[in-house]
Each structure stands twice: as structure tokens, then as C-alpha cells.
Design a protein with these regions (language model features):
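Short, functionally critical alpha-helical segments immediately adjacent to catalytic or ligand/cofactor-binding
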Residues: 36, 45-57, 108-125, 157-161, ...
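Boundary at the C-terminal end of the N-terminal hydrophobic targeting segment
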Residues: 17-19
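An acidic, Gly/Ser/Thr/Pro-rich helix-cap/linker signature
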Residues: 22-95, 101-104
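Acidic, glycine-anchored loop motifs typical of Ca2+
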Residues: 196-204
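Substrate-binding/active-site groove segments that recognize
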Residues: 132-141, 154, 179-194, 215
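Sec-dependent N-terminal signal peptides
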Residues: 4-13
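Secretory-pathway/luminal and periplasmic proteins that interact with or process carbohydrate-rich
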Residues: 55-62, 122-131, 143-147, 164-169, ...
């Protein structure tokens, strides 16, 4: 099924004349500069920041093909929540124990979760991305699929540059415009990033204290419940109506008591209180319906908080899986 989806993607991906797209992009860019001026951004910042902005066709290809759409859950988890990554997290915790202990105490976010996010987002800072973020955001703003979202992100980024909180020369990251050790979008930088080392710059790539504290602040402010569970992998012993099953990350629905899930034939949850509430998530049903053995998870409130970080069912399960692996090792 996955191979079929990839083939469909390759066959249906639109092919345009690159030169004609560049002409249209440059027309759009001129209009965007006017919009940026109306947002109160200085002409100097607009010109300096956008002078090298260009249309990146590769960004559109990345946008149309994302692992969340084509990898099944078990493959997704196995590639990311690895033993080698867990051991690397353990070594980094030993090296930076004072920082992680301090941040956990201050923000009430477990060090294991922060290490898991760091490991999955950028392999602990090794893969922060090499794309020109301004060009990436400009390309995605010009593109029709999510133009409004990315245009807002680009405006926010220009404002941060204008306020001298971000150095434009450091802005290299992911194809989607995310930046630094924990891959913050501009809106996340604006809302949650912290100058933790007090040098009057937010340095999410160069400064580990800034990066870790900013990630903890983000998770804390979106409502993370300290030392509470994220999910529990379960088995289904009989069919369950699809109305009870979450296959979309947009909003987790149908929280029910553990006692009800037991009556529905879900096993391996004896250690959880019958009064606790959880929702049933089966990520693969959305894409790979013929997979009758799709992994199933009962998820709790904290799982939804991870989805606010990255709205992907598989990402949420994978982060919590790696966090549990790290916790069991240290």
C-alpha cells in the first residue's frame, strides 16, 4: 500500500516551468514586502532579510511527501525511538545534568521528555537543517496549500529580526521553516523562546541553555501535567466501532473510562485505574486500512500536549516511547 501511495505521489506531482514559477514568485515577493511594511517592519529589515529570498522547488516536494503520510506506525517508531538514541540521550544527560535538573525543577517538565524531543527533532543538534529558512517560508507562503499559515510565520520571523532577537545570518533550518535544536517555528520562538543564558539573544541553535529552557517553557505553557502518563499500548480482542477510534491528529475525541475500554475488549490495562479516562488512537487506520494488526494506543491528556508541538499521531507516540526508554535507562 505504501509503495502504491508513493507511486501515486510521483505520478501526480505537478510539473511546472521553473522559470515561469520564478517570475510569479518574484511578483508575489514584491507584494509581500508591502504587506510586511504595513505590519510595522522596517524597510531596512525587509530589504536585508528578503534580498536573497528565492523559490525553492525542493521545499514543495518535501511538503507533499512527509513520512507521517507514508510510513506505518511501527516503522516510524523503530526509525526514531532507537536504542542508540536512548544511549546518546543518557550520555548527554550526564554531561549536562545540572542544566536539565534545573530546567525540570523550574518548568515541571521531565528531562526525559526534553531529551526525547531533542533526539527526535534534530538527533541532538546534529540535524538542525541546512535550508535557507527565509526562502523556505517565502516558498510555502507563495504556494497555495497553506499560504496563510506560512505568510504569518514569515511576518513573525521578520519582526523578530527587526527587534534584533534573532540574527538573520543564523537562519538555516528545516524545509518547513523550523529552527534550532528543537525546531521552533517563528510563532513558537515569539511565544515560548527564552534567553535563558541572559546574553540578550535568543540562540536556539548555538545555546543549549536557551534551547532546552525554551522547549521546557513551550511544553509547560501548553499544559503539560508533570509526572503523568502519555499513552499505553493496548491490544484489541474484538472489533470496536470506528466512532470510538481516533485516526486524525486534529483533535482527540471520545475519552472514556478505562472500565469502559475493558468492556470493549481492550486488554493489558489492568494496572490503570478504572476511573481514569483515555482515548483510543489507531494511527494507521487513516492511511493503511488493510493492516488488520495496526498498533493501538490508549492516550491520556499529556499525549494531546505533544500534538500541540507537532500535530502527528505517530510523532506523539514516538516521543513518549523514547522518553519512556530514557527514563527506564537512567
Amino acid at each position: 500500500m505504501i509503495k502504491k501511495l508513493l507511486l501515486i505521489f510521483l505520478l501526480t506531482y505537478p510539473q511546472f516551468s521553473h522559470s515561469s514559477v520564478e517570475v510569479d514568485f518574484n511578483i508575489w515577493l514584491k507584494k509581500f514586502k508591502i504587506t510586511a511594511q504595513k505590519e510595522g517592519i522596517s524597510e531596512e529589515t525587509i530589504n536585508n532579510s528578503l534580498k536573497n529570498a528565492k523559490y525553492l522547488e525542493q521545499v514543495i516536494k518535501y511538503d507533499r511527501y512527509q513520512p507521517e503520510f507514508f510510513e506505518d506506525t511501527e516503522t516510524y517508531i523503530k526509525k526514531r525511538a532507537t536504542r542508540s538514541r536512548m544511549l546518546k540521550a543518557k550520555a548527554l544527560l550526564i554531561k549536562n545534568k545540572k542544566l536539565f535538573d534545573e530546567v525540570e525543577k523550574k518548568f515541571k517538565v521531565e528531562k526525559e521528555l526534553l531529551l526525547a524531543l531533542w533526539g527526535i527533532e534534530t538527533n541532538f543538534g546534529k540535524n538542525v537543517g541546512k535550508m535557507d529558512i527565509i526562502s523556505s517560508l517565502a516558498t510555502l507562503s507563495f504556494d497555495k496549500r497553506r499560504s496563510e499559515f506560512f505568510s504569518k510565520e514569515l511576518i513573525i520571523l521578520l519582526k523578530l529580526i527587526d527587534q534584533k532577537l534573532i540574527d538573520v545570518d543564523t537562519l538555516y533550518g528545516s524545509w518547513a521553516g523550523a529552527f534550532g535544536n528543537f525546531q521552533f517555528m517563528p510563532s513558537s520562538i515569539e511565544n515560548y523562546a527564552i534567553d535563558y543564558d541572559k546574553n540578550n539573544k535568543i540562540e536556539l541553535k548555538q545555546s543549549l541553555p536557551d534551547a532546552v529552557a525554551s522547549a521546557a517553557n513551550y511544553i509547560s505553557k501548553i499544559g503539560w501535567e508533570y509526572q503523568s502518563s502519555c499513552f499505553h499500548k493496548v491490544e484489541l480482542t474484538k472489533p470496536i466501532s470506528k466512532k470510538y477510534i481516533n485516526t486524525s491528529a486534529k483533535k482527540i475525541k471520545n475519552y472514556r473510562t478505562i472500565n469502559l475500554w475493558k468492556k470493549k475488549g481492550i486488554v493489558d490495562i489492568e494496572q490503570i485505574s478504572d476511573k481514569n479516562k483515555a482515548a483510543l488512537v489507531i494511527p494507521d487506520l487513516a492511511v493503511i486500512e488493510e493492516n488488520k494488526n495496526s498498533p493501538a494506543f490508549l492516550v491520556f491528556d499529556n499525549y494531546e500536549k505533544i500534538l500541540k508541538w507537532n500535530r502527528s499521531l505517530r510523532f506523539g507516540v514516538t516521543v513518549c516511547t523514547l522518553a519512556n526508554m530514557i527514563k527506564n535507562e537512567i
